[in-house]
Amino acid sequence: MLVHLNNGGCSIVFNFVGDTIEIAHWGAPLSKVTNESVAITKRPIAHGDLDVNPRNLILREHSRGWRGHPALRGHRRGKSVSNHFSIVKHEATKDSFAVQFADQLAGLELNIDYQLDQHGILTVQSTIKNVAEGDYQLEQLLNWLPLPPQADEVLDFFGHHCKERQPQRYPITNGLTTREGFEGRSGHDFTITQIALNKSTNFHSGEAWSFAVAWSGNNINHIEKLVDDNLSIGGGE
């Protein structure tokens, strides 16, 4: 099953994979999406690799073979450190998609809402709920989106009082590219947004994919490139 949101010159495609969901595309508008067009984007399994090759799963769970940074990090006194959520229900319109997941073993419920507006801006909001007895220690809950292979540079911002928002641009390399803020607010060194772009992109033309954490407290922004060249961008508090 596919869910395709198309608005404001932007598309995002969700693909149901068993009891979970992956994001098959986020970026330029698509006129038509089929199961066949999504299937051809699947990466081959290399010799000596895992028998499953998870793509851009929304929750990026290690229990499903994901080897990068997860969406959720937390535990119950050292237990339930690796989650395995399943779809409970979902609802889609032409420009919105809401899905509820549950991990019965961990005692967690997770709701994620996607809204794609008329300007092509995608808003993502995640809410996690502890539905079991005892405390759950939440460490991180990040939202992630896939990037295409032509995204090979990062543009973000740094600064200090009287000279904030200075741009810096550099190549995407293997591993995590991270910008974090620990001031309890969006201070002078806050990057505002982290942008993945092609090295040929300039102020007049080219492709760019921007992710902003709309939060005035501590914040984290990631771009991750795995050894199989899987690229993604994400962030949270």
Segments (PLM) and residue ranges:
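Polysaccharide-binding surfaces and accessory modules of carbohydrate-active proteins
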Residues: 1-4, 8-13, 21-234
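Contiguous, structured surface segment used for ligand recognition
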Residues: 18
